[in-house]
Amino acid sequence: KSIFERDNRRDWLVIPDAVAAYVYETVNKMFPKVGQFLADAAQIPVIVGTRNFLIRETSKLSILAEQMMEKVKTLWNTKVLGYY
């Protein structure tokens, strides 16, 4: 499955999260102490807060983009193609 099918989220951080998970798994297999450092660093309040903020704001942008595309589609169907 693609990461979009596995991770049914609206935010735009799906790909960076998948890359980070892959990097973590690879590093953790080779250097467990460095892997533990990365895991600990990901839990620092500043990083968690920033990540949550980005998820929240990009979700809002995704919803607005979906609404705009729906309006454009409706406008196209009614004004250009003449459907009612």
From Swiss-Prot:
Keywords: Storage protein, VLDL. GO terms for cellular component: chylomicron; very-low-density lipoprotein particle. InterPro entries: Apo-VLDL-II. One of its GO terms (molecular function) is enzyme inhibitor activity. It comes from the Eukaryota. Protein component of the very low density lipoprotein (VLDL) of egg-laying females. Potent lipoprotein lipase inhibitor, preventing the loss of triglycerides from VLDL on their way from the liver to the growing oocytes. This is Apovitellenin-1. It comes from Dromaius novaehollandiae.
